[in-house]
């Protein structure tokens, strides 16, 4: 019984992207899950030929011609004899050679015709069974092809669904990355603006007592992003 075998594999990838926090930012992570599916399809077509055997008994026709003839002849002969002599005589009802030969030929002809009817009926039945077998195989082949087409359509639909899901996940990941970059840019801009608004002031004063005298050195530094001012004052005694 020959059959064909097809093996198909389907790989599903799922990607998960965690959300971003507005306070702490960790490196973007993606979780990829792979799911592999294998489909094995076998196909075959086979038909067992079973010709039903109908064993019909031959028709039986009960012919009572011999008994009827004997009754008619006997009664008629007895009536005639009674009128003539008042006695009866046994009648010999054995068939003549001509009748026997005719009966034999009829029996042979009946047997031949009966065999011919059986052969014709068997041939007709075999022919119809063969036609039915061909029709059944054609219908089975048609159904099998339709099922194969449906299976191919189902696989193509699942592939399209997987492609669409992956494309959707890619777009979502790109959108998340874009939003994270925009958030980082805003935080950098916020830090720059805070530095521009901030001021830093430093006061330094140094006092030295030496043999030459008393020395005092002082200075004030005020810095900002756009302005740096340094003022130094030096005193010597």
UniProtKB/Swiss-Prot annotation:
Biased composition (Basic and acidic residues): 1-17, 91-105, 226-237
Domain observations: CAHS proteins contain 2 repeats of 19-mer peptides designated as CAHS-motifs that comprise each two octapeptides connected by a tripeptide.
Function according to Swiss-Prot or TrEMBL: CAHS proteins are cytosolic heat soluble proteins that seem to contribute to the anhydrobiosis in tardigrades, but their specific mechanisms are yet to be identified. It is possible that protection during anhydrobiosis might occur via the stabilization of vitrifying small molecules such as sugars, but not via the direct glass transition of CAHS proteins themselves.
Coiled-coil portions: 98-201
Cellular compartment(s): Cytoplasm; Nucleus
Keyword Cell membrane: no
Record's keyword terms, sorted: Coiled coil, Cytoplasm, Nucleus, Repeat, Stress response
Highest taxon in the source lineage: Eukaryota
Note from the entry: Trehalose, a disaccharide essential for several organisms to survive drying, is detected at low levels or not at all in some tardigrade species, indicating that tardigrades possess potentially novel mechanisms for surviving desiccation involving tardigrade-specific intrinsically disordered proteins (TDPs).
Region of interest: CAHS motif 2: 169-187
Protein name: Cytosolic-abundant heat soluble protein 1
Lineage of the species this protein comes from: Eukaryota, Metazoa, Ecdysozoa, Tardigrada, Eutardigrada
Family from the record: Belongs to the Cytosolic-abundant heat soluble protein (CAHS) family.
Keyword Kinase: no
Region spans: CAHS motif 1: 132-150
Assigned GO CC terms: cytoplasm; nucleus
């Amino acid at each position: 019984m020959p059959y064909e075998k097809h093996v198909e594999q389907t790989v599903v990838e799922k990607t998960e992207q965690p959300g971003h926090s507005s306070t702490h930012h960790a490196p973007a992570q993606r979780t990829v899950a792979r799911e592999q599916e294998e489909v094995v399809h076998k196909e075959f077509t086979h038909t067992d030929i079973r010709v039903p055997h109908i064993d019909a008994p031959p028709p039986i026709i009960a012919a009572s011609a011999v008994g009827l003839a004997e009754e008619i002849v006997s009664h008629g002969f007895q009536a005639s004899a009674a009128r003539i002599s008042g006695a009866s005589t046994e009648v010999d009802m054995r068939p003549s050679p001509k009748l026997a030969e005719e009966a034999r030929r009829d029996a042979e002809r009946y047997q031949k015709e009966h065999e011919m009817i059986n052969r014709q009926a068997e041939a007709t039945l075999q022919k119809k069974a063969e036609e039915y077998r061909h029709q059944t195989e054609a219908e089975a082949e048609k159904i099998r092809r339709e099922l194969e087409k449906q299976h191919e359509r189902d696989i193509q639909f699942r592939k399209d669904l997987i492609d669409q899901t992956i494309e959707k996940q890619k777009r979502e990941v790109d959108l998340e990355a874009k939003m994270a970059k925009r958030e980082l840019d805003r935080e950098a801009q916020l830090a720059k603006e805070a530095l521009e608004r901030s001021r830093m002031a430093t006061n330094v004063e140094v006092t030295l007592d030496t043999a030459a005298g008393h020395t005092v050195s002082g200075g004030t530094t005020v810095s900002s992003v756009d302005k740096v001012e340094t003022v130094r004052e030096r005193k010597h005694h």
